[in-house]
Amino acid sequence: MGDDGVGIKIGRELKRQGYKVEELGTDIFSLMRVYNGENKVIIVDAVLGEIPGKVVYFKGEDIFKKLRAEIRSAHFMGAVEGLKLLLEVDERLKNAELHFVGVTIKEPKLGLELSEEVKRAIPRAMELILSIIREGE
């Protein structure tokens, strides 16, 4: 798990801190099994970009517009389309605030360690995610 595992690393740290986290892997549709009506759904993943270690954030419809146009996910082939379809078939998700937090990576590589650029992005991504969670509490 090289840089493309940054979402898993962040998720596991959030889980360690007591937050509800589900690892979906490459199957966005497994969200249907684990979603229980939470007000907010935050998807965290590595995204391909030119500059590794940049934290990107999209909310609501911007996820579909900007993510497709600007950055493609390192894991989910067609994740944007899959998520849009999921919102159509699962009525429960229509009321949830949807958020996407990504950390850019240059390219997925085999390996066990994160690059320094991506490691340095984790605290910024965590801070952003925690602010999303706290917003409106």
Curated annotation (Swiss-Prot):
Pfam families: HycI (PF01750). GO terms for biological process: protein processing. This is Protein FrxA. The lineage of its organism: Archaea, Methanobacteriati, Methanobacteriota, Thermococci, Thermococcales. It comes from Pyrococcus furiosus (strain ATCC 43587 / DSM 3638 / JCM 8422 / Vc1). Transmembrane segments: none annotated. One of its GO terms (molecular function) is endopeptidase activity. Gene3D superfamilies: HybD-like.
